[in-house]
Amino acid sequence: MAARSPPSPHPSPPARQLGPRSPRVGRGAEVHAMRSEASGFAGAAREVVADESDKIWVGEEGSGGRRGPGGAAPAHAPLLSAPMGSRRLEGISVEEAMVTRTQLLEEELSSLKEELALCQADKEFVWSLWKRLQVTNPDLTQVVSLVVEREKQKSEAKDRKVLEILQVKDAKIQEFEQRESVLKQEINDLVKRKIAVDEENAFLRKEFSDLEKKFKDKSQEIKDTKECVQNKEEQNRLVIKNLEEENKKLSTRCTDLLNDLEKLRKQEAHLRKEKYSTDAKIKTFEDNLIEARKEVEVSQSKYNALSLQLSNKQTELIQKDMDITLVRKELQELQNLYKQNSTHTAQQAELIQQLQVLNMDTQKVLRNQEDVHTAESISYQKLYNELHICFETTKSNEAMLRQSVTNLQDQLLQKEQENAKLKEKLQESQGAPLPLPQESDPDYSAQVPHRPSLSSLETLMVSQKSEIEYLQEKLKIANEKLSENISANKGFSRKSIMTSAEGKHKEPPVKRSRSLSPKSSFTDSEELQKLRKAERKIENLEKALQLKSQENDELRDAHEKRKERLQMLQTNYRAVKEQLKQWEEGSGMTEIRKIKRADPQQLRQEDSDAVWNELAYFKRENQELMIQKMNLEEELDELKVHISIDKAAIQELNRCVAERREEQLFRSGEDDEVKRSTPEKNGKEMLEQTLQKVTELENRLKSFEKRSRKLKEGNKKLMKENDFLKSLLKQQQEDTETREKELEQIIKGSKDVEKENTELQVKISELETEVTSLRRQVAEANALRNENEELINPMEKSHQSADRAKSEMATMKVRSGRYDCKTTMTKVKFKAAKKNCSVGRHHTVLNHSIKVMSNVFENLSKDGWEDVSESSSDSEAQTSQTLGTIIVETSQKISPTEDGKDQKESDPTEDSQTQGKEIVQTYLNIDGKTPKDYFHDKNAKKPTFQKKNCKMQKSSHTAVPTRVNREKYKNITAQKSSSNIILLRERIISLQQQNSVLQNAKKTAELSVKEYKEVNEKLLHQQQVSDQRFQTSRQTIKKLNLDLAGLRKEKEDLLKKLESSSEITSLAEENSQVTFPRIQVTSLSPSRSMDLEMKQLQYKLKNATNELTKQSSNVKTLKFELLAKEEHIKEMHEKISRMERDITMKRHLIEDLKFRQKVNLESNKSFSEMLQNLDKKVKTLTEECSNKKVSIDSLKQRLNVAVKEKSQYEQMYQKSKEELEKKDLKLTLLVSRISETESAMAEIETAASKQLQELALQSEQVLEGAQKTLLLANEKVEEFTTFVKALAKELQNDVHVVRRQIRELKKMKKNRDACKTSTHKAQTLAASILNISRSDLEEILDTEDQVEIEKTKIDAENDKEWMLYIQKLLEGQSLTLSPRLKCNGAIVAHQNLRLPDSSSSASAS
């Protein structure tokens, strides 16, 4: 069969960019992943069928999936690169996959059709030949010409294929050179980018240094503010001392007024009892109303919660139905694909059956032809035996004839002597000599023939044998004639003595004796010479036949080897083509990634990615060695053919030289025999001339042989140089591959550097945010300083208000004198005073209000009403301000009014209460966080802040007694002036604000410390993993080096024939370990506890400065990290410069090699010119030989007539033999192909079934994992919603309780105010003026209760709105969470399909 080129591939799909896959929403991504992996399995099966020579499952570069027939992931072609897992195209839909599948099937069908057409053409050709041969008188020449033309077409097709392959190789070399240039440009671009990045880093460092300078300036400003605060506190102490002296003077006045008040209290006691009874009744009614409203609100909240739960569950059910429908569609699609695969396999089975039937038919035809061939071969063998017997008989006859010829020659010499005597006698008798006739036979001018073919040599052999027989018959006839002539000559000599007549010499007997004797002698010598020449020719022709047969054998061997190589190349080409198709379908990578060598530790696992990658690497090396081996075999075959041709040419030249010598000797002999009468000088001159010619010819032959030797040596040298250049080219290719690998590593390193730079920029931005937060803390400290300045202003105003309040505070002196001892008690004594002392109720209520406020602020600081978020530093400043406003307003709510103008001032206090409520609500929503989010963050961060809260509680407990001691001393004046109480409350508020700010700073610092610790642990873990990988890679490198040594030994054994060896060394670069410095966090010990509040403030400021120093130390550590990374970047730059130097050196080497190539080409040109000159000389010699050959052609024509029949039969025999051999080869090829197709189909079916089963199992596992993750996520969401709802309810209950307490406190205040004498007098005067009873007047004054009821209603409505808002937020979050959960589930499923080992990490995330 003629060698056929494989079908041209369809145009590849456009290459898509690689990168991290964007997961689709829903379960579409899972389906797509399953489909893409199914196509990958099919491609792997095709690869196994195509490349049977090396059945190694090749892994994808950097792929996470397993390879091999039992692996879960598909095996891809070795051309697939990758860096990085088994990646698939994402955007391919089901229809596109089906279209690609149909295209592949159409290509396979077209290739099968072409093969069938070629088989049919071969079959028809054989049948036509058979029909022509079956005719009675077949035209064998036509048959032979048809076969020769067919073989010529096949050889031409093979040569075209070889040329196409060479062109493809040249194109690939050009592509590689272009890629080298592109990669160099990319390196230059990367260097420019690095320079730009370095400039940006330097700019950022400058900015950082400027920020540090600013920070130092601000720290100095804080120190200055501390000093100012200390000075102001000393001034405040002096002012307080002056006020205490004034209070002592006022206390003496108060004692006088208290005596008057005791008289009036007895009258008021009776009135109070009546009022208390009425107030108790009103309270009971109000409590009942409040409880009823609460029950209604609770029922409404439950109803809303249940409705929300119903809506959520309905949406979840709808989503689950949608998921079920999607899963059903996917199952249907998979079933359809399975059915299509089954139909395809059935069609292929039918095709295989048809091929088997065709093979059976061809086998029958070949058997019939073999029978015919055996019959013909038997007949030919019989003919050959008969001819051999005849040849042996002729040889024996020739020996006998030679003996008879020698005897005849002796007789001829004797007769010539007798004839000479007779001639002398005749001359004497006649008186004048007759000239001897000179006969020149033109038939003996022989010429050196051109190179005869095998058939012409065989015909020569047969013709010369027939000539020998013919000459033997002539010799017999000549012997008979000689005997007759001798008898006639004797009788004639007797008669000539008796007679003396002059005219008798013209009689016929005398004529015969004179004319026939030289002719007969000449013919005898001619016949002897012809015999010798024929024997020599036979020997030469036998030698030429042997050489030609050797040539043919070597040519046949070379052609068979070339055919085998072509078949190998065809199979490899098909395999590569299928791999290219798979690569184009699987992943259109623009960058061809080279397979990295695996670590030795990774090779310990039997079925790992590293093992498959290593196998792929060795497979490539094996393929390269096979290609080299094939090239060397081709060169060996060509050299063998050239040697055989040279041998045949030398033999022919020797034969021509021998024939020339014989002809010259023969001619000289003829001249000697014919010209006996001429002088001997001419003969000697002729001999000398012939000898000179012979010597000249011998010298020419020797020079020609020397030149041929020199040319052979030059050819050998050129071959060696070509081999050396080939080895250099291979080394350069390997160097380019290593360079490409190194460039890829450099690019990866630059990408890592860019990632590190981005991480550093993120860290710098975080540090900038921290710096801004510190700036805001400084601003808050400035605000505290301003508040301290503002504290002085109300103290000055208090001096002015003290003179006005002297008359009003006269009644308070007696009370303050009685209850001085009670104000010095601790908190426990305050509680005991509440239970035991009913008389001192007013004073205890005052102290209790202060205590409640302190508890409220402590609860606020404990429960985390301050903002906990680290990133939003703006919100921290806002929360600190809102906290201050809330605390001030709540303190205004609780503060009692002692003046007589309390009724007028009640309205603004109520307004402040409403404002405080609104501010509380706004505070809850300031940061953009809902209370749900806030409490979620709080619960997430509780364990990290437990230690801090304990410390803060301890410090608050230590600070409480100091505050109580100060309040003991101050409460004496607090009963005299309300302004002092307000100042104290403002002081408390400012201190609590500072506490909250410092707590926030501490929390943020601890969070940053924990984050840095976690980052450090992760980096250490990564370092350990990288060390393990490095050790495994070393071990694998050692093993692979040993394997490489073995392979190199085999290669050297192959290259011993051509005396060229090449050694390949592979070095593995060690990855530089990047050490990250650990972040050291120095814990600062708390300073001493101060006795006074001012010292506590200093302590807190010191803590703030300590935290600032901590952060500055963190900044320094980050600086050190930056420096380390800069050093790493410098090292990378140095590596790049080294690589560039290596590249330049290798370029110089390539240029030197190119120069050497040019020199060699010039020397080749000179040799070619020499060869042309020699060819011209040979042509001249051949022309001379052709001139001499004309004389031989006449004899050949006589011989050809006798030899034609024999040559025709022999040609028929040889042609039939060759045809049978070709048919045998075709049969073997067809049988091998059929077996290959059967095995391939079986392997495809097994692999497809296994892979479909594995895909089904994987899909089931992935679906189960995704369902489990979804269930867990839904449970967590439900728990979170229940937690948030419970929290909201508890908050509402707490708010209601606080409101009740506020109302009770207000009522107590009113009752207390009613007990005062001034108010009693005012009420009596008002009743007397208006002519109204006291009870009517109290009813008129009780209008405030209705206002309070309305406020409670408004508060209840606000609470309802808040609950609804929380429920809406929960609903919105559930809706937003559901698609996210779906996306996460899809991503997890996709990762489980690709990397089953990473499923646990994905579910945890």
UniProtKB/Swiss-Prot annotation:
GO BP: centriole-centriole cohesion; protein localization to organelle; protein-containing complex assembly; regulation of protein localization; single fertilization; spermatogenesis
Compositional bias ranges of the Pro residues kind: 1-14
Single GO cellular component term:
nucleoplasm
Q: Which residues carry this modification: Phosphoserine?
A: 5, 22
Where is there biased composition of kind Basic and acidic residues? Answer: 48-58, 896-907
Sites of N-acetylalanine modification: 2
**Cellular localization per UniProt:** Cytoplasm, Cytoskeleton, Microtubule organizing center, Centrosome, Centriole
Protein name, per record: Centlein
Taxonomic classification: Eukaryota, Metazoa, Chordata, Craniata, Vertebrata
